[in-house]
Amino acid sequence: HEKTAEMEKGMRTGKKLTAEILSGKWDEALKSFIWITQRYSSRKTLCKAVASYCEIFGEMPVEIYSAPGRSEVGGNHTDHQHGRVLAASVSLDAIAVAGRVDEPLVRIQSEGYKLCEIRLDELDKKTREEGTTKGLIRGVLAGLKQQGYKMGGFCAYITSDVLSGSGLSSSATFETLIGTVVSGLYNHAEIPAVTIAQTGRYAENVYFGKPSGLMDQMACAIGGMVYIDFENEEKPQVEKIDADFEKAGLTLCIVDTKGSHAGLTHEYAQIPVEMKQIAAHFGKNVLREVEEKDFYAELPVLCKESGDRAVLRAIHFFAEDERVVKEVNALRAGDWNRFLKLVKESGDSSYKYLQNVYVSHDTVSEPVAIALAVSERALADKGVCRVHGGGFAGTIQAFVKEAAVLDYKNAMEAVFGADSCHVLKIRRYGGIRVIG
């Protein structure tokens, strides 16, 4: 992954780093990142994080790292079927203040959570840690160690504005951040972004116990707008797409519907399970290996064999996988109207066929559906909206024409509360050492 151009050799103590930040020494370096938002326009966030680190772990040499949230733009639930996706890292992020220690112990304090301590000679999976932050940390450390990367003890204080369970992939952000810290502290910041992403997915699947594709981690680790083809999942094809949304007069908005993904792992997990059932009918492992014409030829049999929902979800996959290619071509051609039309089609397909807008047995709580309805009314011809990420709860995505952003934000916050509509930028960088 990329290193900061402004990086200087030699770690600074917390006290020295705070003084440098307050003096403005790092202002130009920070401004050079396209992703710096209001969180960084004040130096308070970084200084507060450094102060919290020193309060918990003591005064010692430290560095600052960052990993972004991500927004999937196209390819809703295609990655776990070895399909294609279009995703972007966004200007919400998690930052870590981290410093090396001599003992083989990793201690991580996330703001608002309990301190996690993991010994580096005890990296085997612990079943009781499934679904926990500690499980994710242990998984990332184990995965990197298994691949032969240098490992050592460190302390880290983490603060994040990537909402948990919100469809911005807070878990992938966290995994990327831990991998980036290990890379920076012990491996000369030379662990490839793709390796950090694959290790994060390993941690999530094996140690955390949640089935997921690789899209979230790839978008967080690599950064920018990325087109990823997972046909060969061990060596995914990754291409950065140069798309200037600001120049096109479009703004990415993420609306937090205040419904969390927490407790919805089963609903989320059923999607790959059902898609793989359809693939298994053809003797294949995933839908990417199945010919679409063969699928449609067997439709009546598949409906009886796997049920209508599984078939509808496969219908979504085939159309969505092709749609990603069309979206990429539209962006390359600068055809923004075509791109927006395809984004809307993606959302419609997720709603009708993938069926990940609400939980079928919970008719009382359908906040994503409400958000989409309110969005369509508020936007009219001034933008498009869709469910993104895992779905079922959390957030929706909207691409809004610049002149309509304030009205859209007001309309959404009238329903979901103050600060529920996040106006974002696409961040150029993935996991990165900011100061070190």
Question: Where do the PLM segments sit?
Answer:
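Phosphate-handling active-site elements
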Residues: 146-154, 182-196, 402-415
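Structural signature of FAD isoalloxazine-binding scaffolds in flavoprotein oxidoreductases
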Residues: 82-102, 222
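Beta-strand segments within the central parallel beta-sheet cores of soluble alpha/beta enzyme folds
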Residues: 107-109, 153-160, 190-202, 340-345, ...
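Glycine- and acidic-rich phosphate- and metal-coordinating loops
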Residues: 141-164
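C-terminal nucleotide
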Residues: 3-70, 95-130, 227-386, 398-436
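DPxDG-like acidic metal-binding loop motif
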Residues: 89-91, 168-188, 397-400
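Alpha/beta catalytic cores of group-transfer enzymes, especially the acyltransferase/condensing modules
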Residues: 188-237, 241, 346, 372-375, ...
